[in-house]
């Protein structure tokens, strides 16, 4: 279930300020953020945002197809190491 249209998309205030500052200076430095719940807006296209996954920051380059999604969708929090093998082997 999505967010109400009258409220608009959520984006962290500090993240929005950093992006607007870089857009005005034509700067494309990596922006670190812990705000995984922030929605990707069209003004973020072309920026690289380092999203925290609980352990480290994962760099995410924003493209047009990502607009409307959340930042956390592109920084997985769990590592999949495969299913456990049968220790007894084939009999």
From Swiss-Prot:
Keywords: Ribonucleoprotein, Ribosomal protein, RNA-binding, rRNA-binding
Gene3D superfamilies tied to this protein: 30s Ribosomal Protein S19, Chain A
InterPro entries: Ribosomal_uS19, Ribosomal_uS19_bac-type, Ribosomal_uS19_CS, Ribosomal_uS19_SF
Record bears the keyword Cell wall biogenesis/degradation: no
Classification via SUPFAM superfamilies: Ribosomal protein S19
Any one GO BP annotation for this protein: translation
Keyword Ribosomal protein carried by entry: yes
GO terms for MF: rRNA binding; structural constituent of ribosome
Pfam families with a match to the protein in the record: Ribosomal_S19 (PF00203)
GO cellular component terms attached to this protein's record: cytoplasm; small ribosomal subunit
Similarity section: Belongs to the universal ribosomal protein uS19 family.
Alphabetized PANTHER family for the sequence: RIBOSOMAL PROTEIN S19P FAMILY MEMBER, SMALL RIBOSOMAL SUBUNIT PROTEIN US19M
Function: Protein S19 forms a complex with S13 that binds strongly to the 16S ribosomal RNA.
Protein name (database record): Small ribosomal subunit protein uS19
The gene coding this protein: rpsS
